[in-house]
Amino acid sequence: MTNATSAPPARADRAPASKALFDRAAAVLPGGVNSPVRAFRAVGGDPLFIARAQGARLFDADGAEYIDYVGSWGPAILGHAHPAVIEAVREAALGGLSFGAPTELEVRFAEKIRELYPSIDMLRCVSSGTEATMSAIRVARGFTRRDAIIKFEGCYHGHADHLLVKAGSGLATFGAPDSAGVPESIARTTLSLPYNDPAALEAAFAARGGDIAAVILEPVVGNMGCVPPEPGFLALVIDLCRKHGALSIFDEVMTGCRLARGGAQERFGLRPDLTTLGKIVGGGMPLAAYGGRADVMRVVSPLGPVYQAGTLSGNPLAVTAGLATLDRLTPALYERLEELGASLEEGLRAAAEGAGAAACVQRVGSMITLFFTKGPVRSWADAATSDTKRFSAFHAAMLARGIYWPPSQYEAAFLSGAHSEEDIERTIAACREALAA
């Protein structure tokens, strides 16, 4: 791995194999990638192409080694290529890759999720977080027979049309599309409100409570950086939904099994009506799920009129990886993640203060963000004050020192059980140098 005290080489000279692969990719993939954040557009330069991963390490196409804080954007809570998960998937593959028919494995998976999440009576497996949130909203609309939904600025729930929406100019105005290709007629059914703003939420329900099918949110936001809920905010969401006949949806694709075995709802002691899960529950494979109250989930086909299907839903390899991962989420793992997270938080904060940087560090469990703004960051409006140019320079300097930090100011970093105390020390040392550069 690059020594944290060595002078960083020029970026173009550091990864010629990645550069060659990116040039090839640009000819056949839009932007050279299969998901926009991977292109490094937010931080400049070309992305690294990863050849393999092990534990808390990534190895790029040029053979360089990095301490990884992206963790495949959250799933790798045990670290990469955990031997037990790899062996379970290898054994399952010998029995067939996909059947398009029910299996005992998917029943065991559903039973395990229900054990971890008391709010979930029944669930349906899908293949991505976008599918999970899209389906949960369809279920909420079908159950309530209403169309409007509330989301919060800075909360990302996948790329379904009705979720790629930003707020209009007024409190309860119609939404406007945040992406080309999203019809305004669809966007108008989505109300976007400031996160952590109880007054705005109460006013929206007062104005349009009878139209609202659901409120969906990340209970701890990770897609504008790590932003925790203000005390009482999550409970208010649930209470207002119940009062007005709407459904509360916790999007725990990121926080599920990350903040606790039972996710944010275990950590905060709350039970939403519907929950979406992904990332960790798939053990690094394409697996997600949505579920909740039995009376709500009974509207899902073939029991009810809300249609949702998928060729690879409940895929045996993905479910096997998920079960192997879930079985290894022990109290000791979360204690270790908390200790490592606290050490990293303290070190990053001290490094920022020592450099005189206008920055703040926010962490919940093993999710953490160094914001280049004074903070605290409670909403998208706060996050948007971050100095993204300073972050880009920081990211490049960290990468040059062997630290693979998320390539966006607005993405949380993740710790895993494979990180060591030495990894944390190296990362803090690299951060001190990066901030002084």
From Swiss-Prot:
It is an enzyme of class 5 (isomerase). GO terms for molecular function: glutamate-1-semialdehyde 2,1-aminomutase activity; pyridoxal phosphate binding; transaminase activity. InterPro entries: 4pyrrol_synth_GluAld_NH2Trfase, Aminotrans_3, Aminotrans_3_PPA_site, PyrdxlP-dep_Trfase, PyrdxlP-dep_Trfase_major, PyrdxlP-dep_Trfase_small. It catalyses: (S)-4-amino-5-oxopentanoate = 5-aminolevulinate. Pathway: Porphyrin-containing compound metabolism; protoporphyrin-IX biosynthesis; 5-aminolevulinate from L-glutamyl-tRNA(Glu): step 2/2. One of its GO terms (biological process) is protoporphyrinogen IX biosynthetic process. CDD domains: OAT_like. Coiled coil: none annotated. Pfam families: Aminotran_3. Its cofactor is pyridoxal 5'-phosphate. Its EC number is 5.4.3.8. It is found in: Cytoplasm. GO terms for cellular component: cytoplasm. The keyword Cytoplasm applies. The modification N6-(pyridoxal phosphate)lysine is found at residue 279. Belongs to the class-III pyridoxal-phosphate-dependent aminotransferase family. HemL subfamily. Homodimer. This is Glutamate-1-semialdehyde 2,1-aminomutase. It comes from Sorangium cellulosum (strain So ce56) (Polyangium cellulosum (strain So ce56)).
